[in-house]
């Protein structure tokens, strides 16, 4: 998979979660903050990243840098996705279904941020199992990575799109 250059895209960021984490040492607890951020150009490119630091803004900055390194391209057909798909990560699972125009983004929390920043404006989704923000984001990314356009599948099979769709 080729890397996407984040400098050529106008990326928008969205903070999905900020957590206070503690490391217990002999003298007490060492507190730090971890941040989960999703970035996207609302035109088929989206990425997520995590960052950890002693201050919240620094954790968010690190997460944004990380997210720009993990960009993926999402195939979009009109305003929705090409086909139904199920994304898995850990105990989290998400079902993504294409929706007719005007439906809007029907998704909960972390998945909504990913789908909106990817540029998908009509989609139905249902999250099952673990609802931890990081697991939901990773499961959504797993689902989005599985998506393929009809043209790509036809090319792989050596057929025309008409032959595939019958």
Swiss-Prot record:
Keywords: Antibiotic resistance, Ribonucleoprotein, Ribosomal protein, RNA-binding, rRNA-binding. The keyword Protein biosynthesis does not apply. Pfam families: Ribosomal_S5, Ribosomal_S5_C. The keyword Transmembrane helix does not apply. One of its GO terms (molecular function) is structural constituent of ribosome. Residues 11-74 form the S5 DRBM domain. Signal peptide: none annotated. SUPFAM superfamilies: dsRNA-binding domain-like, Ribosomal protein S5 domain 2-like. GO terms for cellular component: small ribosomal subunit. GO terms for biological process: response to antibiotic; translation. With S4 and S12 plays an important role in translational accuracy. Located at the back of the 30S subunit body where it stabilizes the conformation of the head with respect to the body. NCBIfam families: rpsE_bact. Part of the 30S ribosomal subunit. Contacts proteins S4 and S8. The N-terminal domain interacts with the head of the 30S subunit; the C-terminal domain interacts with the body and contacts protein S4. The interaction surface between S4 and S5 is involved in control of translational fidelity. Belongs to the universal ribosomal protein uS5 family. This is Small ribosomal subunit protein uS5.
């Amino acid at each position: 998979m080729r890397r996407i250059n984040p400098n050529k895209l106008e990326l928008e960021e969205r903070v999905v979660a900020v957590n206070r984490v503690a490391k217990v040492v002999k003298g007490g607890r060492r507190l730090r903050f971890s941040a989960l951020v999703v970035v996207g150009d609302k035109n088929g490119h989206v990425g997520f990243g995590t960052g950890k630091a002693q201050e919240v803004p620094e954790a968010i900055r690190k997460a944004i840098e990380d997210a720009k390194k993990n960009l993926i391209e999402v195939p979009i057909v009109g305003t929705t996705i090409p086909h139904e798909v199920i994304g898995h990560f850990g105990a989290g699972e998400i079902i993504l279904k294409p929706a007719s125009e005007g439906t809007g983004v029907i998704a909960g929390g972390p998945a909504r941020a990913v789908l909106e920043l990817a540029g998908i404006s009509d989609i139905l989704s249902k999250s099952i199992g673990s609802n931890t923000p990081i697991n939901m984001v990773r499961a959504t990314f797993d689902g989005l990575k599985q998506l393929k356009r009809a043209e790509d599948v036809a090319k792989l099979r050596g057929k025309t799109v008409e032959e595939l769709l019958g």
